[in-house]
């Protein structure tokens, strides 16, 4: 579910999309799976001179994302007292959409 939510947010991430639209795409996947109450933060935030900066992909941000922004893509589900899952990548917003610049593999490894 978290991976599907991340993919939905990434698909929406592009210059001109608002932070709320990007967050909403991911949040819908999580809510539709029954975990909406357990996603308590925004989809992502700007990464630059500081690790957390503008622009943010959150429900409150109605500003359009600028071309050239670098943002995190980090949806998560956290079940109190049990466990949490978060997948975090970094996106570069280009004129054509976005590029996921994180090169870590996404396949599930069972050890």
PLM regions: where:
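Active-site neighborhoods and metal-handling regions in enzymes and metal-associated proteins
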Residues: 1-111
